[in-house]
A protein has these predicted regions:
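Phosphate-group recognition and catalysis centered on beta-loop-alpha active-site segments
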Residues: 1-175
Length: 175
């Protein structure tokens, strides 16, 4: 099967990682959705890609600088188009309620270490299938995820050149 991932939702048509982008992805026929998870100051898991919100909202700083309630007051849509003025940040659990029961494949990137258990708890609560891949550049986060659930599908994102050390690590950890 060929997976047509909507990267951060239909991010060419709506502000990335918003409900509008995820809804648009389905309208356009995507059979996969890629998204990014981070933790807020008060411990909530939200969907957002960048390290800072400066270019994707009407405020400045990091997701971890704000509580979820504070983030709800920010505009995450106008940067893309005034049509999306007032677009809210998405709580991962709200996304999960709406989408994880659908016949789609999901690529969920962990941007922060330490959100593995809560992420898995939410997935297990709402997912009706196992077409979910957890990815991260942080190998430790993936190791933590594997310890919690030995059956979860993992994908290690690598920035540097692939070398024998990385290959051996993957082979040994996937026995």
């Amino acid at each position: 099967m060929f997976i047509n991932y909507a990267h951060r939702g239909a991010s060419e048509y709506a502000p990335e990682n918003t409900m509008s982008a995820f809804d648009m992805a389905l309208q356009l026929g995507a059979n996969g959705i890629e998204l990014d998870l981070q933790r807020t100051k008060d411990g909530k898991i939200v969907i957002f890609h960048d390290n800072k919100i400066d270019n994707k909202s009407n405020k400045k700083g990091k997701i971890s600088d704000y509580t979820y309630q504070e983030l709800l007051d920010f505009d995450f849509g106008s940067w893309f188009s005034l049509k999306y003025k007032g677009e809210k940040i998405v709580l991962f659990e709200d996304f999960a309620k709406k989408f994880l029961s659908k016949s789609l494949t999901f690529a969920i990137e962990l941007k922060d270490e330490g959100i593995e258990k809560e992420t898995l708890d939410i997935i297990k609560k709402y997912a009706t299938h196992n077409n979910i891949y957890i990815s991260s550049f942080d190998y430790k986060a993936l190791e933590n995820m594997r310890k919690i659930d030995s059956n979860i599908k993992l994908a290690w994102l690598i920035k540097e050149k692939i070398n024998n050390e990385n290959i051996n690590k993957l082979l040994n950890d996937n026995k």
